[in-house]
Amino acid sequence: MYCEKLILLLGCFWISSSASDPADPLLVDLPNGKLRGRDNGNYYSYESLPYAEPPVGDLRFEAPQPYKQQWTDTFDATQPPVLCMQWDQFIQGDDKLAGNEDCLTVSVYRPKNSSRNSFPVVAQIHGVAFMFGGASQNGHENFMREGNLILVKISYRLGPLGFVSTGDADLSGNFGLKDQRLALLWIKQNIASFGGEPENILVIGHSAGGGSVHLQVLREDFSKVAKAAISFSGNALDPWVVQQGGRGRAFELGRIVGCGQASDSVTLKKCLKSKPASEIVSAVRNFLVFAYVPFTPFGPVVESPEAPEAFISQHPIDIIKSGKFAQVPWAVTYTTEDGGYNAALLLEKQASSGRELIVDLNDRWFDWAPYLLFYRDSMTTIKDMDDYSRKLRQEYLGDRRFSVESYWDLQRLFTDVLFKNSTEISLDLHRKHGKSPVYAFVYDNPANTGIGQGLAKRTDINFGTVHGDDYFLIFENIVREPQLRSDEEIISRNFLKMLNDFVLSENGTLAFGTCDFQDNVGSSKLQLLSITRNGCENLELESFP
């Protein structure tokens, strides 16, 4: 907390005394010294700017500390950001280790050819399960083409380095969320030096990034760093976001890397700090039950109230019900087949048998379902888990077997349990207990190729509108073809205009194309905007009792 107050106090001086050189816009003055960016034609980039001290040595498993080094030479801001160290499931081969432990940076992208002297700001928190990915995983050429917004991408600690927790004050966890928070403070205090408007900051994220954004909003002081927020296909109530069972995983991690003698959190933390980061991160493979399931063995937790600088010390449901969260305009979204992100891997044909993994669910459903659907640690007995697994299977598949032919029913189950239901519950709770506008949209417009085809490694299946089909119209991604259809081009431009208008709105209104979003606060029903290739329309759903 002291660090945040110090930054906010110093920020007033920084904003008034720091600015880019009008004669050389690539040269920017910061409190740490001068930096030089890159000219990319229609925008300038200033990449890999440190916002925190390297989280190594004694600073590993600690809250991030503001970066305070002074540059004697001009800082080279032309190098792309490194990945935070991770065990990347999408790397081929046995060694999936990537990235560096010293990785806490932001990258700033500023329009070049524009009549504006200053720009509103979009801060992006990247996704991918709190385990891998990075600030450079999504492109930004499409985003920058309109020339209306500054984009800032945030890197933060991932996996066990970012989220291991013993559930007490000694190894509290949520270090990745605390990184994000410090990065947002850095943006608030320094973005004016790049021509940004610190009073007009919109924070967005997709998937784990969306869940992160919502968790940031659930801090009352979020309004000090941002004006509004959007969570795409991820929010704090999704069952894969806030985890239980962290203490057991923390000590299991210790056992794997040679800290098995530790019987308390202090000893475990000290031992883990002495181990190579590569060993800690590589241990992730030991937590996978099959393929890369569970997707998120290490993620956000509810911290002990005694933890120093706790990020959250209550469950998000309780925070929302208390009304003690940031009263800023917030939007949340999902796609009609969001669950394809978790289900599509089951359609990959196995090299050993030539059959799809989904067939094995017929014999392994009770073993695998709790990990696939993230209720393994939320139920106390095997009987409870088996009863719930049986109920889910009966509700969505009846007596039919798991197969390629029944895949869509399984995908619908995954969408409902992991995304749709929790999004609507979150929307309803904000409607009842919030004061600022709350919006939602559901996206239904399948990409020609998307994350479903990428995970299943096949193109003969129609996956529908899966995870990312909307977000990747804003930020291009390698999993989908770069050339947009004519309908996607229109939607893409409407999304970009939506972001621009939302951050500039004085009363928190939100619109997409010709459709105005309906505010859920004060409404007797849930209000969602449906976006398809044919346009948009408002939907009303019954609220929860």
UniProtKB/Swiss-Prot annotation:
Disulfide links within the chain: C84-C103, C259-C271, C515-C536
GO cellular component: extracellular region
Coiled-coil features, chain-numbered ranges: none
Stored InterPro entries: AB_hydrolase_fold, CarbesteraseB, Carboxylesterase_B_AS, Carboxylesterase_B_CS
Gene Ontology MF terms in the entry: carboxylesterase activity
Taxonomic superkingdom: Eukaryota
UniProt signal peptide: 1-19
Enzyme class, UniProt record, top EC level: hydrolase
Gene3D superfamilies: alpha/beta hydrolase
Sugar-bearing residue positions: N113, N421, N507
Pfam families cross-referenced by the UniProt entry: COesterase
Catalytic activity: a carboxylic ester + H2O = an alcohol + a carboxylate + H(+)
Subcellular location field: Secreted
EC number: 3.1.1.1
Active site: S207 (acyl-ester intermediate), H467 (charge relay system)
Keywords annotated in UniProt: Disulfide bond, Glycoprotein, Hydrolase, Secreted, Serine esterase, Signal
Complex and partners: Homodimer.
Protein name: Esterase-5B
Organism: Drosophila miranda (Fruit fly)
Taxon lineage: Eukaryota, Metazoa, Ecdysozoa, Arthropoda, Hexapoda
Name of the gene: Est-5B
